[in-house]
């Protein structure tokens, strides 16, 4: 029975949390998430890059019903990880197209690959590749950058690179030499109109306790991902629900843009405000829920569960000791009653008159 108590308490607490009133929305913010659902086999085909970018631009101009509205009333446009399958910062025509797409005051938040010289000099030395979240102003100028810091081994970098490359394994990474990691701890993005943003690219959203790495608490999580690698397996739903758990742990709203799904807006209690299913093509127009007060996990981290585990271990130990004491006392009382009955029987036998024939 003791073992069931934690599960029952978690269930009751979860029902109570989910039944609460909807979180208030951030003032004067209206986002559009674009899920173009580009097949993974086409994503990195050089011959299809222009068509994919043009399709991304066109889909962004339409509301969820398919009506063309040219982003009227939208303050922030969200594209998924590597939405532009090329290096947009190396293509001025792409930046011009972004500027032509965005109305005055609207910003684009998009995943993209980029090159940068790493070191003291920005003009000398080899350039390194980054998997990045880029924020563009309404004229196509770059405003902010977040570079992914938790890279996927063998997918984005090659562990023991020198050794493995010597035996011909560098082809395991798409980018020769692999991607480089961004600045740590994870910096927060300052985006006009939004609370401080923690950018999360792909599977950076699956690690509990690691989505916030600085002293300042963000007010919003933005997760850009491409789960097309997983196809129609259980991978995309699992990845989505893991990111929802991060929102619950931190009490923060989550905006998730995925190339093939699942894209969604989730509040700080893990409730889905809006969603596009796996392989569904379309857009989400939504407000952004406000952050909640930091829940226990956000304040204490894994000590929350360690403390609960110790508490219920102590309760189980106390219950086991109590049962042992009860059993021992029961045996003692039983022995005492048996002894009393034996003594009484002996006394009765001694007192009985002896009759002779």
Stretch-by-stretch model annotation:
Residues 1-357:
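Enzyme catalytic cores with a strong preference for nitrogen-chemistry domains
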């Amino acid at each position: 029975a003791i073992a069931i108590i934690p599960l029952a308490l978690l269930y009751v607490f979860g029902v109570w949390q989910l039944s609460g009133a909807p979180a208030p929305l951030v003032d004067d913010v209206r986002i559009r998430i674009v899920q173009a659902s580009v097949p993974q086999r086409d994503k990195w085909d050089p011959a299809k890059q222009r068509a994919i970018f043009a399709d991304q631009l066109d889909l962004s101009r339409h509301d969820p019903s398919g009506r063309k509205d040219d982003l009227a009333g939208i303050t922030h446009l969200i594209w998924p990880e590597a939405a532009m399958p090329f290096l947009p910062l190396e293509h001025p025509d792409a930046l011009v197209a972004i500027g032509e797409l965005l109305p005055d005051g609207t910003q684009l938040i998009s995943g993209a690959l980029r090159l940068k010289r790493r070191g003291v000099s920005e003009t000398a030395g080899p350039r390194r590749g980054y998997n990045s979240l880029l924020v563009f102003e309404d004229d196509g100028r770059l405003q902010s950058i977040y570079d992914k810091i938790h890279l996927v081994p063998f997918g984005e970098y090659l562990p023991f690179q020198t050794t493995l490359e010597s035996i011909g394994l560098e082809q395991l990474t798409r980018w020769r030499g692999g991607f480089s990691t961004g600045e740590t701890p994870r910096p927060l993005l300052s985006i006009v109109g939004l609370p401080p943003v923690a950018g999360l690219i792909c599977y950076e959203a699956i690690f509990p306790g690691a989505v916030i790495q600085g002293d300042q608490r963000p007010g919003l999580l933005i997760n850009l991902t491409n789960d097309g690698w997983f196809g129609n397996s259980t991978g995309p739903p699992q990845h989505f629900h893991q990111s929802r758990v991060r929102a619950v742990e931190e009490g923060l709203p989550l905006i998730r843009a995925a190339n093939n799904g699942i894209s969604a807006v989730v509040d700080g209690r893990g409730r889905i405000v809006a969603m596009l299913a796996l392989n569904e093509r379309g857009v989400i127009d939504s407000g952004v829920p406000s952050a909640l007060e930091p829940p226990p996990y956000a304040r204490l981290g894994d000590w929350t569960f360690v403390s609960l585990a110790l508490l219920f271990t102590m309760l189980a130990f106390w219950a086991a000791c109590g049962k042992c004491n009860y059993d021992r006392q029961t045996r003692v009382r039983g022995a005492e009653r048996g002894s009393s009955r034996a003594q009484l029987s002996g006394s009765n036998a001694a007192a009985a008159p002896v009759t002779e024939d």
